[in-house]
């Protein structure tokens, strides 16, 4: 569908937005947030709620948002998730079909220390997040990102949040090849 997107994932609170916005400034790419494109605040009573009632519905909204936003001749960094918590607080993979439609040039994954992520989320959202669920979510994102990279035959760059600016170096090589 698209041919000018790099997808960067990571769990809530790992620092994706900050890192991705920095990379976009550095590489003159356009920053896109999956939650903004699918208008999360319109479909959820509590925008800080991390559980998703209908994951396929939200992901279809993402594709619609991308279709209405993406322009030829521009390069985009889309920040989102490989997996989400469903309404039962179970980890659920985003369908590979969604990634096929996004058609990213490369994948990035930002990992973080779960204790730091939990602390950041607890403060930001004024909630007490479950350490085990956050760890399970991050582990699931790592495994699934590797699966997607192999299935889509595109590179995956994995970085720790405290050293994720290396991601910029990897992406600049892809970006400069265009």
Region roles according to the model:
Residues 2-5:
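Pre-Walker A (Motif I) flank of P-loop NTPase domains
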Residues 8:
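Hydrophobic anchor at the beta1->P-loop junction of P-loop NTPases
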Residues 12:
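The conserved Walker
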Residues 15:
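Conserved glycine(s) of the Walker
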Residues 21-62:
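Conserved substrate/cofactor phosphate-moiety recognition/catalytic segment
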Residues 72-81:
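Loop/turn-to-beta-strand initiation segments
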Residues 80-124:
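ATP-dependent NMP and nucleoside kinases share a basic, alpha-helical "lid"
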Residues 127-167:
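Small-molecule kinase domains that catalyze NTP-dependent phosphoryl transfer to phosphate-bearing small molecules
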């Amino acid at each position: 569908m698209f041919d000018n997107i790099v997808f960067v994932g990571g769990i809530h609170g790992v620092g994706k937005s900050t890192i991705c916005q920095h990379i976009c400034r550095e590489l003159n790419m356009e920053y896109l947030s999956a939650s903004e494109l699918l208008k999360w605040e319109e479909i959820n009573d509590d925008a800080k709620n991390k559980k998703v009632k209908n994951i396929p519905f939200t992901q279809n909204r993402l594709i619609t948002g991308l279709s209405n936003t993406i322009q030829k001749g521009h390069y985009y960094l889309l920040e989102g998730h490989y997996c989400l918590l469903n309404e039962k607080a179970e980890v659920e993979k985003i369908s590979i079909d969604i990634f096929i439609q996004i058609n990213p040039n490369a994948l990035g994954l930002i990992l973080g220390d779960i204790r730091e992520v939990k602390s950041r989320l607890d403060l930001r959202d004024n909630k007490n997040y479950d350490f085990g669920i956050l760890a399970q979510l991050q582990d699931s994102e790592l495994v699934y990102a590797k699966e997607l990279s192999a299935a889509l035959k595109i590179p995956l760059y994995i970085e720790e949040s405290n050293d994720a600016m290396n991601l910029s170096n990897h992406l600049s090589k892809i970006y400069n090849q265009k």
